[in-house]
Amino acid sequence: MSDAVTPCSSAKVPSVQEFITTSSDTQTDRPRPPLSRRRDKPQLSCNACRRRKVRCDRLHPCSNCSSRGHGSSCEYAPTTPTTGTAASTITEKPPLPGPLHGTASNMQNRIDQLESLVLGLMHQHQTGPSSRASPLEEPPPRPITPDQRAASPSVTGSDRILTFAPETQRDVSPTPSDYGSIRIQQTGVSYVSSSHWAAILGSIADLRSHFAQEDEAHSRSASHVQPPTAFPKPQLLYSSLVNETPASIVKSVPPRPVVDRLLSRYFNVLDIAPAYVRQQYEEFWKAPHAAPIMWVGLLFSMMCLSTQLQQALLGLNKPSPTLGHSRRPSQAAESQETVESYKEKAIQCLILGHYTKGGPYVLETLILYFLVECFHLKDMEVGVWMLVGNIVQVAILMGYHRDADHFPNISPFAGEMRRRVWAMIVQLDFSISTQLGLPRLVKESQTDTAEPRNLHDSDFDELTTELPTSRPETEVTPTLYVLAKLRLLSVGVKVADVATEPRPHSYAEVLELDHQINEARSALPSSLKWSGLGSSLNVPSQIIIQRIWLEVIAQQLKIVLHRKFLEPSRLQQHYGSSRSACLTAAMKILQLQRLVDEETQADGLLYQSRWRVSSAFINDFLLATSILCFCLQSHADEQKDTNRTSKDAEAAPVDIEEIRQLLNTSLVIWSRQCASSREARRAVAALRYVLGDSGIRSEPHPSEDVLSAPVPAAAISYFPGFSDLMTEYDLPSLGLEPTIEGTTWPVFTTNLNNNIDHWAGVTGFQQMDLSS
């Protein structure tokens, strides 16, 4: 009943498709000869392929079942004993009561009956005397003594410390949905982890595929179809040999007044201290042809990014009648041609400089090129994730995963810059991998690079022989936000492992990680700790966005950690606090979504920094939406389930009405973005399905252009079709641009090649915070 590919086990649950068969399809209708005369060949094909009379490749699951989306129901006949009495097995599938065709309401009732029947069969398989105890089976919770109850703090909200009786030491074995989901289509194969928002929504919609088929013709709209991009992204991975030479590329650099304006905007708006680059920039104009080709690529990347930023600030990519003026299409086209020209030159410089070998300016140019490719990206390409992989590999090749203190030939200044670059790469890797639902590339066990220090750029330079001690975190420096985010992500990587690893983890590990999330959140610098909008009235909008983003990260980690305890197979009371923590975190994120939406309007506190927001939060907003959709749908199913026992009741009451109100507000926000966002249309489809008649049919917001204008972004969620229900919505290119949220882009000194005169001396951008 799911697209997830799960390991084959001895206790399989028949799928809905296998229930909806006639009695002639079963194998038990044929009379069988006595055991003494029986010489049947062993059945090597799965049951489904045998019924369809097609060749089976005997995999677990087989390719035929996987291609049809029935991987979890791919079953093989049990081995029959050769002597003695045959083992008693259930081979006949109970028929679906009533006719197979009827109204939508009747079909919905039958689906609900099937869900109850399947859960009953699962319980029967797990508790039957002839079957082995399943690792998914949970014994009844042990009673908690008064002493244990008194020792448990009664803290409400997502910051509660979850404390339970000693049974928390047993393993929480992964369920089939914990292994993630694989989608096999003619266009390719895609995988997302179980913690991805699309996989969560897919768990709601798997049994409703027939609704998508009935409404498919009605829901498809040609107005959503957008032409494909001219080039696949990232272009660097698809570029062929370069016909240009370094001399011809340098000759194509615009006149200095043009470049001066571009770099001025780049440094001022993107928060980069230009001191280190300025010296090299002056040297470049003295002898342009003497500059390393990789530095020229760095220059073109900065020029390209500055032009894209101008597009974002002026809104050249989209007309805006609400702003009281019109924009010339020719102006937008000319600006885009300039962007493409600068980007092409940066790619040529990377290729001519043999970027895979590493060296001075390589990582800086690759990182800025990555941002250029993602700046107006409508639909996250998996190639972008592969580009991040290239950046990680080049960094490891150059030894960035090892702390510079191990190597005496690296100066203190260069070593600190390397730490800043590595910190940015770690954040980039975690962000992109998480939003794509894929494993991260950097393994903590293989790195020992220290955190960068909390220092101002003026605290040290290339002549420094010993780094000063880190400033107290009460002082705001360009690296303070990076440090705060790194500490949250240090817990985040552990949470991701527990949530997605196929091996079981004890519930005590879950509780310990929950405690670590609370500690990391409490340890955030006071200047970056979110305590409500009322305490942020006298701080810059950039700081407000940083505070909100750190709070969203902390709540997102709570969701990923506790999400699996929302599943029907884990409804025991001793998991009630996990469910409460997960739902509370999701509700807080949607409250922040509403706040960000309100404050990015023309009269809001975040209006001047709205370009920094873009879709930096999009993946976590979608994750929270999917969690509350799952909760609301599960609550509706529980109301129909008369067999629910008291031990399965929630440990803490859930305010369903508040959840419904949050989802209605979220529906309004997502609906305004449907014209350009595929992910928004998926969210709207799920919300309208779950909310039903209570879903608000919103009208376009008068400030829609403010939210949908292109802005820099670097990592958005992508999943090519998470369930058959979503196929009823035509989902073209994604329109919410991705963002690098709060990463810094320092360029560092590298003394790896002292033969390159002043070009190998200083290569330093200091800070570039693109979303906060």
UniProtKB/Swiss-Prot annotation:
Example of a GO MF term: zinc ion binding
Keywords per UniProt: DNA-binding, Metal-binding, Nucleus, Transcription, Transcription regulation, Zinc
Pfam families in the record: Fungal_trans, Zn_clus
DNA-binding region listed in the record: 46-74
Low complexity bias locations: 77-91
Region (Disordered) location: 1-43, 64-93, 124-179
Function: Transcription factor that regulates the expression of the gene cluster that mediates the biosynthesis of pyrrolocin.
Protein name (Swiss-Prot/TrEMBL): Pyrrolocin cluster transcription factor fsdR
GO annotation, biological process: DNA-templated transcription
CDD domains linked: fungal_TF_MHR, GAL4
GO cellular component, one term: nucleus
Location(s) in or outside the cell: Nucleus
